[in-house]
């Protein structure tokens, strides 16, 4: 599952007190009715069927920020999210003299709320539809390149049709490697304002040592407010805008939790790879994640050295540092967790059972052939990914990356809009401009140069087979 779509993670509170549910894990909402009996037995008190409706209560109160999950918690458009999800907006409004990162921020009235960082959005899901048949029609007979181009164009066409309704941002999400496609229509709230963010001493209490750990005693929350035009339509920032009135909002219970209480987290964490093959799992945990962890630690050290504490440059790069530390801790935890549960060994056992099942009946031989072809493609993909990893990093610094994107934009604009690559269509231009605007407050030449030298040296240290010949010239 590749695109950012709605997932639910179900688990039991009081982990030490009793075993986890057999259905622990990440599920799409439409899968929940299938495990309704287990959910009820585990402690869910509402009808599991209601959790499959993303436009009804309670799921309609859960929204996406385009990279984070959030929820409406008032009829006046108040949105609660994680502190780190709003930290970029806190950083954007901070200076060395007026540092909201250190001091926190509170708007005591709506008139005191601050504009969120450029490009900030609240996406409210309004409609879900299955478009699998339309996307996949006739593609099985096509060559791989034709198949890719056909699917890509159909997805763009479906998205464009959906976005003919002004103020909406649409997404075609792919599931199971292109087996299923779902169209998600979302109201795009463009006027987002910062209401409250705790000081880092609260919002980042415990720092990266406590991050991703349990129990955790961090005030990891912040508040935004969503605004729309007086007629309720999506609009850019304006003093005339009014708070968005959501159809549904959540009420926060003051009762707290007891050991064994049922807990379900609903949101947009991105993707899950439950059916990844053994070779892909091994490549992920033996090369990709360890290599990335090493790079992230060097990257963090480079920024901290080039942007000392208390400098204006450190304020500009605080949000990036927080993101890098967050990601490094996450990857390191995944590596440790995979080793602890013997993930590679368990996956090998599962695949051995599958191989035995296929071998037991000659009529199943087609499955074996398909799996062998898939594994071969996975090996090719892993090799290409290593080259892309180092090349992507060496072109990652902000100034060089911005220059590349501007050049690419100029080339893409030579094409009809419908044929441009995603990210360079007219629907993407607002984000493009806002990204350039945000760069102004998140760029320091000396830090950017230090980052680039780190990436360049890492790239040059790789064998020629893992570098890009054209770039080397």
Positions of predicted regions on the chain:
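Bacterial N-terminal signal peptides that target proteins for export
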Residues: 1-7
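Terminal presequence/propeptide segments associated with secretion/organelle targeting
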Residues: 2, 16-473
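Bacterial N-terminal signal peptides
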Residues: 8-16
């Amino acid at each position: 599952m590749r695109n950012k779509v709605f997932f639910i993670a179900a688990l039991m509170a009081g982990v030490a007190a009793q075993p986890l549910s057999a259905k622990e894990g990440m599920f799409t909402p439409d899968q929940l009715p299938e495990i309704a009996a287990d959910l009820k037995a585990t402690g869910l008190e509402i009808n599991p069927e209601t959790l499959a409706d993303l436009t009804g209560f309670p799921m309609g109160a859960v929204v996406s920020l385009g990279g984070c999950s959030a929820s409406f918690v008032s009829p006046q458009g108040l949105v609660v999210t994680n502190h780190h999800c709003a930290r970029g907006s806190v950083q954007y409004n901070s200076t060395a003299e007026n540092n909201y990162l250190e001091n926190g921020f509170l708007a005591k009235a709506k008139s005191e709320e601050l504009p969120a960082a450029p490009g900030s959005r609240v996406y409210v899901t309004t409609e879900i539809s299955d478009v699998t048949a339309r996307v996949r029609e006739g593609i099985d007979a096509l060559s791989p390149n034709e198949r890719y181009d056909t699917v890509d164009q159909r997805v763009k066409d479906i998205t464009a049709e959906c976005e003919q309704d002004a103020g909406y941002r649409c997404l075609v999400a792919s599931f199971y490697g292109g087996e299923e496609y779902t169209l998600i229509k979302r109201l795009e709230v463009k006027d987002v304002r910062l209401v409250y963010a705790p000081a880092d001493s609260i919002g980042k209490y415990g720092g990266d040592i406590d991050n991703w750990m349990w129990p955790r005693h961090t005030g990891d929350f912040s508040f935004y407010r969503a605004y729309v035009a007086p007629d309720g339509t999506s609009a850019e920032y304006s003093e005339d805008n009014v708070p968005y009135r959501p159809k549904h909002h959540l009420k926060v219970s003051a009762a707290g939790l007891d050991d064994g209480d049922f807990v379900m987290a609903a949101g947009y964490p991105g993707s899950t790879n439950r059916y990844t093959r053994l070779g892909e799992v091994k490549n992920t945990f033996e090369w990709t994640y360890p290599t990335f962890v090493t790079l992230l630690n060097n990257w963090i050290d480079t920024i901290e050295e080039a942007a000392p504490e208390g400098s204006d440059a450190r304020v500009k790069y605080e949000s990036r540092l927080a993101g890098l530390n967050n990601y490094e801790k996450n990857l390191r935890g995944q590596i440790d967790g995979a080793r602890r549960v013997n993930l590679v060994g368990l996956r090998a056992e599962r695949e051995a059972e599958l191989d035995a099942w296929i071998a037991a009946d000659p009529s199943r031989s087609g499955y074996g052939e398909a799996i062998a072809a898939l594994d071969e493609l996975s090996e090719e993909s892993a090799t290409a990914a290593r080259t892309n990893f180092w090349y992507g990093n060496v072109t990652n610094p902000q100034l060089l990356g911005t220059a590349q994107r501007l050049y690419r934009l100029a080339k893409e604009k030579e094409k009809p809009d419908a044929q441009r690559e995603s990210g360079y269509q007219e629907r993407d231009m607002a984000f493009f401009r806002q990204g350039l605007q945000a760069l102004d407050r998140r760029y320091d030449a000396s830090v950017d140069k230090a980052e680039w030298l780190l990436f360049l040296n890492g790239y040059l240290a790789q064998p020629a087979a893992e570098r890009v010949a054209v770039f080397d010239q």
